[in-house]
């Protein structure tokens, strides 16, 4: 909220007479952070890219810097295109492809039994005109004149009813629609299983209007019907693929392009090994695996033959003239492909490719600071009056902590509207201090463990120095609960309330809230939650 203008004017006037005093007095106008907006719970949120799409963007920039132009390749590939590219091997290759299918448009009848059921759902007899309009609607749906996502609304219009009733009609009057089974599309269509399937189609069209040399790249999703998904296999993945079309393309072109792209990611040395797979769309002997060395990977990745820091990262080859001839392409073409997920895993130290596609596989390793931000008070005041009560009670409890019982100390007195609030700390036992030895314990997070330790002294020193303070403490938690209950009394007409704690064995006793995700994390990692101690504090409030 803005500063009080009258007080600002007073400070301005005072500064003309005594600047140093005015400067010090100005501190009183600065608002203290409340329980709800205090660091570390107060955080400036920032966005964070997904590592997969961050890698895609880095690859896009790498290709562009290397002089390549970005294009979009077809995702839906007719089956016949696979035969043109693979020849006799196509039948085996298609086994890994997903085929597209769709639900048939049935010829739905509207006999007497359907009309009778329709009347039950409508709660009235449909008119002859309504039945005829419904019949016409179903016929139009059969012919494809009405899309599936429009059918509910069209039925509602035909019968002069609402969409909710139309949904019931589809479900109860025409249950056969739920029993429809997908049927393969004709002609057969597949989802792109590798980027090459799209490159032949794209190049055949581009070369009708452009002359070589061409340097093109495309980064997009491919689909492969794996037997199962595991740590290294997904049914959908991203390929960062490029082609070079030129009269002078050779295998060395692939080597040079691989180096140009991968050096931008910190890879320093390269080995090129003939690939034993020998795909039929490549010229025999040109399909090549690219191994690259990265100095930062020496401790995490090791190739059996090349040693630490070496990893297989890409494949390239020259397209077969046999396949090119099927598309009327007269020029040599080099194709390089980089698996985006593979590169992302290498660069980010990811062990399970599924973590890039499914949230449930993402490793969750929150920092101590992130865990500290999760710790809060279960009950806390909602008003500035309640916040002030908390501050003064905490301050007074610190000042009078060592006073011995029997004793009763006033910690707060204030007015809220026409009501007065008075808070006392009470110790009835003779010779016992007003606050026990653990009354001022603060909660820290260290290496994923939660500890409550005193604010000073030898006990807990290492935790205080190396851990992250959560911003919550025992005495403030008790004061916050008391302030919450005082606000409840102010809203209901007054009365008395007491917050009293002796030995603490669980966080809720001092009004601390630990979310389930934090508890699950600490428990799963076998961590500790040591929030306990002899508090021995009693706070009493009266609203009158």
Swiss-Prot record:
Native organism taxonomy: Archaea, Methanobacteriati, Methanobacteriota, Methanomada group, Methanopyri
SUBUNIT field: Homotetramer. Interacts with SepCysS.
Protein name, UniProt field: O-phosphoserine--tRNA(Cys) ligase
GO terms under biological process: translation; tRNA aminoacylation
Catalytic activity line of the entry: tRNA(Cys) + O-phospho-L-serine + ATP = O-phospho-L-seryl-tRNA(Cys) + AMP + diphosphate
Keyword Cell membrane in record: no
Record keywords, A-Z: Aminoacyl-tRNA synthetase, ATP-binding, Ligase, Nucleotide-binding, Protein biosynthesis
Family: Belongs to the class-II aminoacyl-tRNA synthetase family. O-phosphoseryl-tRNA(Cys) synthetase subfamily.
GO molecular-function terms, A-Z: ATP binding; phosphoserine-tRNA(Cys) ligase activity; tRNA binding
Reported function: Catalyzes the attachment of O-phosphoserine (Sep) to tRNA(Cys).
């Amino acid at each position: 909220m803005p500063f009080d203008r009258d007080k600002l004017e007073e400070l301005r006037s005072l500064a003309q007479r005594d600047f140093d005093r005015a400067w010090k007095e100005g501190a009183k106008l600065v608002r203290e952070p409340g329980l709800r907006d205090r660091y570390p719970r107060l955080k400036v949120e920032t966005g964070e890219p997904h590592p997969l799409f961050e890698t895609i963007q880095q690859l896009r920039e790498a290709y562009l810097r290397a002089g390549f132009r970005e294009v979009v390749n077809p995702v839906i590939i007719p089956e016949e295109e696979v035969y043109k590219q693979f020849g006799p091997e196509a039948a085996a290759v298609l086994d890994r492809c997903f085929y597209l299918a769709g639900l048939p448009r049935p010829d739905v009848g509207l006999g007497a039994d359907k009309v009778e059921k329709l009347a039950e759902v409508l709660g009235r007899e449909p008119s002859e005109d309504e039945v005829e309009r419904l019949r016409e609607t179903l016929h139009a749906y059969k012919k494809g004149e009405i899309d599936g996502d429009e059918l509910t609304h069209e039925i509602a219009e035909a019968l002069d009813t609402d969409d909710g009733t139309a949904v019931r009609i589809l479900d109860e009057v025409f249950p056969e629609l739920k029993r429809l089974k997908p049927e393969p599309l004709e002609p057969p269509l597949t989802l792109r299983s590798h980027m090459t399937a799209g490159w032949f189609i794209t190049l055949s069209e581009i070369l009708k209007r452009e002359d070589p040399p061409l340097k093109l790249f495309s980064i997009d999703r491919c689909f492969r019907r794996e037997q199962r998904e595991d740590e290294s296999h997904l049914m959908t993945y991203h390929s960062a693929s490029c082609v070079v079309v030129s009269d002078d393309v050779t295998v060395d072109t692939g080597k040079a392009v691989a180096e140009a792209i991968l050096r931008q990611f910190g890879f320093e040395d390269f080995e090129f090994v003939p690939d034993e797979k020998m795909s039929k769309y490549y010229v025999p002997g040109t399909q090549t695996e690219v191994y690259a060395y990265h100095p930062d990977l020496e401790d995490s990745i090791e190739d059996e033959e090349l040693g630490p820091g070496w990893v297989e990262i890409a494949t390239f080859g020259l397209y077969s003239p046999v396949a090119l001839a099927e598309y009327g392409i007269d020029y040599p073409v080099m194709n390089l492909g980089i698996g985006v997920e593979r590169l992302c895993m290498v660069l980010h130290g990811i062990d399970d490719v599924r973590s890039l596609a499914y949230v449930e596989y993402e490793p969750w390793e929150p920092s101590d600071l992130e865990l500290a931000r999760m710790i809060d008070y279960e009950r806390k005041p909602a008003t500035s009056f309640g916040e002030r009560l908390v501050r003064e009670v905490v301050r007074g409890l610190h000042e009078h902590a060592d006073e011995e019982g029997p004793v009763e100390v006033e910690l707060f007195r204030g007015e809220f509207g026409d009501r007065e609030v008075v808070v006392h700390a009470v110790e009835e036992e003779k010779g016992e201090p007003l606050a026990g030895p653990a009354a001022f314990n603060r909660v820290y997070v260290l290496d994923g463990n939660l500890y409550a330790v005193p604010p000073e002294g030898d006990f807990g020193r290492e935790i205080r120095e190396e851990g992250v303070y959560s911003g919550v403490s025992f005495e403030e938690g008790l004061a916050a609960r008391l302030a919450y209950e005082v606000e409840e009394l102010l809203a209901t007409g007054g009365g008395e309330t007491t917050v009293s704690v002796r030995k603490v064995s669980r966080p809720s006793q001092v009004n601390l809230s630990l979310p389930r995700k934090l508890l699950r994390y600490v428990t799963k990692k076998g961590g500790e939650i040591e929030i306990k101690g002899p508090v021995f504090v009693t706070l009493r409030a009266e609203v009158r």
